[in-house]
């Protein structure tokens, strides 16, 4: 009793007891692990000093390694892209606890672009039946958000439950559709008159086009946010370990440790979040686009 009274034993909810002697953290898959591994190891040392336990870092070549690792308890937490994070949540029950802050935001906006002189396209629904350019089938703002919205709002129906059904829905609902390969390529198809619409991000024209080309385009509509990278923890991690890990990672937001974070993925800060708050709505678009989950995982497979 006296130990508690004298504050020698801390019984508050913010208890600093980490009930495991080691944790393993996964990173976004890369082709050449060496470059990222050295940066990840700086984080490893930092977390070891903050938590007082052994921390292992794993830089895989694909997300399946992380998903299986989380499912079977070999990986406790991981930095992830939005799409794979949602798939991991669906398959293993892992939860997002932190979101990356990039240029002051935890998301960017998916936007529909057309030529300034084209007055026939004024809503997302107006793109149905037109010649459209997506970035890629796994592109968040360039495909998942616009196509997912068209499906959830009932403008396009997918008959079936696989990637073939999704591709058939595209063929049935657009005069033509192209996966251009990126923002710039999609915008160039639009500028060249090959398509009526290009899907992408809110800042794609100013980032990839000269001013004289930027003025030839207009944003039709902003469809909604695409969430930033997240930090996920496994469903089996205890509350106390999770809280301590989150607290330690938030220390990276302060000047003295911030370079550890910015060197990893260019994020300025990590902010607390939940799966539902950060990815929830975006996740529903992945779910309705049949067969897309495997495409998303394949896209990030750097071993192939």
Whereabouts are the PLM-identified features?
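Beta->alpha turn/N-cap motifs
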Residues: 26-29, 59-63, 73-92, 98-101, ...
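A bilobed periplasmic-binding-protein/Venus flytrap-type ligand-binding module shared by bacterial periplasmic
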Residues: 29, 109-121, 226-241
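Ligand-binding cleft/hinge of the Venus flytrap
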Residues: 43-52, 142-179, 207-212
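Short helices/loops that flank or line small-molecule/ion binding pockets
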Residues: 64-78, 91-92, 125, 169-171, ...
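A conserved helix-loop-strand patch within extracytoplasmic ligand-binding domains
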Residues: 101-160
């Amino acid at each position: 009793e006296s130990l508690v009274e004298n504050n020698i034993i801390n019984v508050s909810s913010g208890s600093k007891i980490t009930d495991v002697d080691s944790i393993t953290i996964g990173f976004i898959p890369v082709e050449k692990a060496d470059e990222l591994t050295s940066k990840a190891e700086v984080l490893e040392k930092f977390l070891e000093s903050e938590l007082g336990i052994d921390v292992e870092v794993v830089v895989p070549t694909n997300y399946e390694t992380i998903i299986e690792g989380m499912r079977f308890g070999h990986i406790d937490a991981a930095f992830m892209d939005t799409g794979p994070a949602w798939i991991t949540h669906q398959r293993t029950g892992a939860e997002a606890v932190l979101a990356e802050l990039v240029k002051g935001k935890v998301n960017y906006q998916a936007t529909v672009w057309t030529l300034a002189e084209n007055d026939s396209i004024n809503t997302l629904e107006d793109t149905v039946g037109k010649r459209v350019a997506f970035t890629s089938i796994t592109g968040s703002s360039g495909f998942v958000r616009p196509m997912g919205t068209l499906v959830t709002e009932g403008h396009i129906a997918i008959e079936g439950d696989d990637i073939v059904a999704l591709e058939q829905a595209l063929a049935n609902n657009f005069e033509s559709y192209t996966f251009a390969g990126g923002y710039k390529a999609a915008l160039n198809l639009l500028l060249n008159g090959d398509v009526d619409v290009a899907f992408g991000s809110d800042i794609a024209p100013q980032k990839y086009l000269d001013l004289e080309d930027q003025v030839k385009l207009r944003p039709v509509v902003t469809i909604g946010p695409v969430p930033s990278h997240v930090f996920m923890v496994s469903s089996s991690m205890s509350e106390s370990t999770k809280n301590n890990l989150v607290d330690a990672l938030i220390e990276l937001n302060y000047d003295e440790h911030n370079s550890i974070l910015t060197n990893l993925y260019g994020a300025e800060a990590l902010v607390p979040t939940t799966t539902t708050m950060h990815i929830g709505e975006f996740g529903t678009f992945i779910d309705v686009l049949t067969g897309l989950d495997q495409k998303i995982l394949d896209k990030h497979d750097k071993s192939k």
